[in-house]
């Protein structure tokens, strides 16, 4: 049986509201993440990713409320990331209805945290989110470095080596974002995605840079990703989930089309 590729819209949530805007027709409140989630669920998204970018830990309770209300209304799996620093954070998100929890900076700071989380909750619900920038110069072998704290802090850590280490620690999935491409609409960094996907035995989600439906196809066909994440092309109604799935299927990618 061929593993079907997944399309995952991503919503950035700050203080309980969607930021970067969502332009859905017929949505009463496009800033409400639960309304946006319901629209994506109805449109046939395979999964949804919430990224909590709330700056202060005082407002963390809002994301728990968002996840809980989304779980009440939606059937698609939901991954939640942003500010996950402890086993208690993961437990609370899972209890609220998240299917998977994404760990970013905390995994860089303490790789054993990933092992503890996977041991306690199972590999299948632990995603490690990798934000990487290309640091190799022209003519050099490709090399990417991990950045943390929303891409502001270089770590000196090689992204591909780190990805392998995270899977060894128990990550069940990797979310790989190219910081060079993020928001540019110039397509995924295929070299980055493929370099990681070819080295690990877990699903890899390509992220950062989608501008066209061809970019989604390339993420799977050329980048060897098992899932493709996008934000603005769906949020602003450039393409629908249905159009994206049909296009990918027409280009030879196995998709769930029901």
UniProtKB/Swiss-Prot annotation:
Enzyme class at the top of the EC tree: lyase
Pfam families in UniProt: His_biosynth
UniProtKB keywords: Amino-acid biosynthesis, Cytoplasm, Histidine biosynthesis, Lyase
Top-rank lineage group of the source organism: Bacteria
EC number of this enzyme: 4.3.2.10
Pathway membership: Amino-acid biosynthesis; L-histidine biosynthesis; L-histidine from 5-phospho-alpha-D-ribose 1-diphosphate: step 5/9
Localization in the cell: Cytoplasm
GO annotation, cellular component aspect: cytoplasm
Catalytic activity: 5-[(5-phospho-1-deoxy-D-ribulos-1-ylimino)methylamino]-1-(5-phospho-beta-D-ribosyl)imidazole-4-carboxamide + L-glutamine = D-erythro-1-(imidazol-4-yl)glycerol 3-phosphate + 5-amino-1-(5-phospho-beta-D-ribosyl)imidazole-4-carboxamide + L-glutamate + H(+)
Active site, UniProt feature: 12, 131
Subunit structure, interactors included: Heterodimer of HisH and HisF.
Family: Belongs to the HisA/HisF family.
Function: IGPS catalyzes the conversion of PRFAR and glutamine to IGP, AICAR and glutamate. The HisF subunit catalyzes the cyclization activity that produces IGP and AICAR from PRFAR using the ammonia provided by the HisH subunit.
PANTHER family: IMIDAZOLE GLYCEROL PHOSPHATE SYNTHASE HISHF (PTHR21235:SF2), IMIDAZOLE GLYCEROL PHOSPHATE SYNTHASE SUBUNIT HISF/H IGP SYNTHASE SUBUNIT HISF/H (PTHR21235)
Protein name: Imidazole glycerol phosphate synthase subunit HisF
Organism: Agrobacterium fabrum (strain C58 / ATCC 33970)
């Amino acid at each position: 049986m061929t593993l079907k590729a997944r399309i995952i819209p991503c919503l950035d949530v700050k203080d309980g509201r969607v930021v970067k805007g969502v332009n859905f027709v017929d949505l009463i409140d496009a800033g409400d993440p639960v309304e946006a989630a319901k629209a994506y669920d109805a449109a046939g998204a395979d999964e949804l990713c919430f990224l909590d970018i709330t700056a202060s830990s005082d407002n963390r309770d809002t994301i728990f409320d968002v996840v809980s209300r989304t779980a009440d209304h939606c059937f698609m799996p939901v991954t939640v990331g942003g500010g996950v620093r402890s086993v208690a954070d993961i437990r609370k998100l899972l209890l609220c209805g998240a299917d998977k929890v994404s760990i970013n900076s905390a995994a860089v700071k303490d790789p054993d945290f990933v092992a503890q989380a996977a041991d306690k909750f199972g590999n299948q619900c632990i995603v490690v989110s990798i934000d990487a920038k290309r640091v190799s110069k022209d003519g050099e072998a490709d090399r990417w470095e991990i950045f943390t704290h929303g891409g502001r802090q270089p770590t000196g850590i090689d992204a591909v080596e780190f990805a392998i280490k995270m899977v060894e620690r128990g990550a069940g999935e990797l979310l790989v974002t190219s910081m060079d491409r993020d928001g540019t609409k110039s397509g995924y960094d295929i070299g980055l995605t493929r370099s990681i996907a070819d080295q690990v035995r877990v699903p890899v989600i390509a992220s950062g840079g989608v501008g066209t439906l061809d970019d989604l196809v390339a993420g799977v066909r050329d980048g060897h990703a098992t899932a493709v994440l996008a934000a603005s092309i769906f949020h602003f109604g450039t393409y629908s989930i249905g159009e994206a799935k049909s296009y990918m299927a027409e280009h030879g990618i196995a998709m769930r089309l029901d």
